[in-house]
């Protein structure tokens, strides 16, 4: 076998691989001898079929199998012998000329193919001891815990039907039918809808007109959908709602005590406070972690500058760009609304894609040299976490991860990355700084904010993660039930 390098430009490589016809013939003969005792051909005793006859009957199919094996296995062997790693799956090209292909299958011509790929650039690890990060720490106050428990108590409060008029804070149960220009519209009908007056869960003007109603009342109200309402056919439109009031209920007083804790499945209010404090600390800890990680990645990005494989950057950019356009569409906005143009946004997100790929390669190299491993138990826990996120789809999710190439890698990648970050935090200078909740949660996008206002851009930029073009490969969640048009939700 002969390997000839035909291209070495930047990170791009192309090799020409030539396997002489006599070598292919020898391989085929070996394979024919292996199958000789197993084949059954009429007119011949088992094991007595002449090799020449076997070649005539099975030669081309065996040669085709050999060709497939070679193009599947040899590129990896060749790259290993050259001390190279391909950034993506190498592209293999063979002759498309049928006559030439037939000669190869009959061992009458050399088998030639090309291997095109981009190498992962060699990365010389640098001393990280000069990196300094600040870890913001928030002390969870008693007031913070009590406020959260108050919210929990409000969500768990009970209501008792009452006679008389509905007031703010009461829960009304209604049937309603919405119309625009006298015609009912999709999503404008509901039965036994429960609404706490004053919660601002429905569109503006809806709840206010129900203050004072009583059980059994029938009423028609007029409202105007907000100009930025997600459903374009309703945005800015005046609508009427025919309402039947089925029940008015007053809220029971909120009492934060052991009885509330018991209702929530806990033994005491002290245990409730302990759990709530832990949840708040965990939430703050996650924010702290992300901000520390951002500082670390920013400084690593300054330390390492090298060319990135174009195909990896292309794949990462497509992931980002797809998300940006989805977010803009859902927000009903355009690039012009965000004081930018599509061309400018593309350029900015291309830079972000390059950064992600570069950091991914750096973290991968650091992790490999440090011996960072993701255990089977960690992978199993990550898979279970995925299953919890998609209730009712557990079987589908399992099948996805079993049968989809790269799916397991999508679970491993973030686990590996976080473990590498943990390793780096033992080598860099970390200074704790006590801050307020407001300071911790203040928007901090740093240099990764590619444009001025776009919420979708915040989502993309905030990740700055070290993927290698393999962003989440998990199946999409099923779409939630369609929201009623009147219900804006308090989310």
Swiss-Prot record:
GO terms for cellular component: cytoplasm. This is Trigger factor. Belongs to the FKBP-type PPIase family. Tig subfamily. It catalyses: [protein]-peptidylproline (omega=180) = [protein]-peptidylproline (omega=0). Consists of 3 domains; the N-terminus binds the ribosome, the middle domain has PPIase activity, while the C-terminus has intrinsic chaperone activity on its own. One of its GO terms (molecular function) is peptidyl-prolyl cis-trans isomerase activity. Gene3D superfamilies: 3.10.50.40, Trigger factor ribosome-binding domain, Trigger factor, C-terminal domain. One of its GO terms (biological process) is protein transport.
């Amino acid at each position: 076998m002969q390997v000839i390098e035909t291209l070495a430009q930047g990170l791009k490589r192309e090799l020409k691989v030539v396997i002489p016809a006599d070598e292919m013939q020898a391989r085929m003969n070996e394979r024919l001898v292996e199958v000789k005792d197993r084949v059954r051909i009429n007119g011949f005793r088992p094991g007595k079929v002449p090799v020449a006859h076997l070649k005539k009957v099975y030669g081309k199919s065996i040669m085709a199998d050999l060709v497939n094996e070679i193009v599947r296995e040899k590129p990896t062997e060749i790259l290993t012998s050259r001390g190279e790693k391909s950034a993506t799956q190498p592209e293999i090209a063979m002759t498309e000329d049928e006559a030439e292909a037939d000669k190869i299958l009959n061992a009458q011509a050399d088998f030639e193919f090309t291997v095109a790929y981009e190498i992962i650039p060699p990365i010389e690890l640098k001393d990280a001891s000069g990196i300094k990060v600040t870890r913001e720490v928030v002390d969870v106050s008693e007031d913070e815990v009590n406020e959260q428990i108050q919210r929990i108590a409000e969500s768990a409060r009970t209501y008792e039907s009452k006679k008389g008029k509905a007031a703010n804070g009461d829960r009304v149960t209604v049937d309603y039918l919405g119309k625009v220009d006298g015609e009912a519209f999709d999503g404008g009908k509901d039965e036994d809808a429960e609404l706490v007056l004053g919660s601002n869960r429905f569109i503006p003007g809806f709840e206010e007109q129900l203050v004072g109603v009583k059980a059994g009342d029938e009423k028609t109200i007029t409202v105007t959908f907000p100009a930025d309402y997600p459903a374009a056919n309703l945005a800015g439109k005046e609508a009427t709602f025919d309402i039947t009031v089925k029940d008015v209920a007053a809220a029971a007083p909120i009492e934060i005590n052991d009885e509330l804790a018991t209702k929530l499945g806990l033994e005491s209010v002290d245990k409730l406070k302990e759990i709530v404090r832990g949840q708040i600390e965990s939430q703050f800890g996650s924010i702290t972690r992300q901000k520390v990680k951002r500082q670390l990645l920013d400084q690593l990005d300054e330390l390492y500058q090298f060319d990135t494989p174009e195909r990896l950057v292309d794949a990462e950019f497509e992931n980002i760009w797809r998300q940006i356009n989805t977010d803009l569409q859902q927000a009903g906005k355009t690039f012009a609304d965000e004081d930018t143009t599509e061309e400018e946004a593309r350029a900015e997100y291309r830079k972000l894609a390059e950064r992600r790929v570069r950091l991914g390669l750096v973290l991968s190299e650091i992790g490999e040299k440090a011996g960072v491993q993701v255990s089977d138990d960690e992978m199993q826990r990550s898979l279970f976490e995925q299953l919890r996120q998609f209730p009712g789809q557990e079987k589908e999710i399992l099948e996805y991860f079993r049968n989809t190439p790269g799916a397991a890698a999508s679970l491993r990648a973030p686990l590996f990355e976080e473990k590498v970050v943990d390793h780096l935090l033992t080598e860099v200078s970390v200074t704790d700084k006590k801050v307020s909740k407001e300071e911790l949660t203040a928007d901090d996008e740093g240099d990764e904010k590619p444009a001025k206002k776009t919420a979708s851009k915040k989502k993309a930029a905030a990740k700055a993660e070290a993927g290698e073009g393999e962003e989440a490969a998990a199946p999409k969640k099923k779409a939630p039930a369609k929201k009623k048009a009147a219900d804006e939700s308090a989310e």
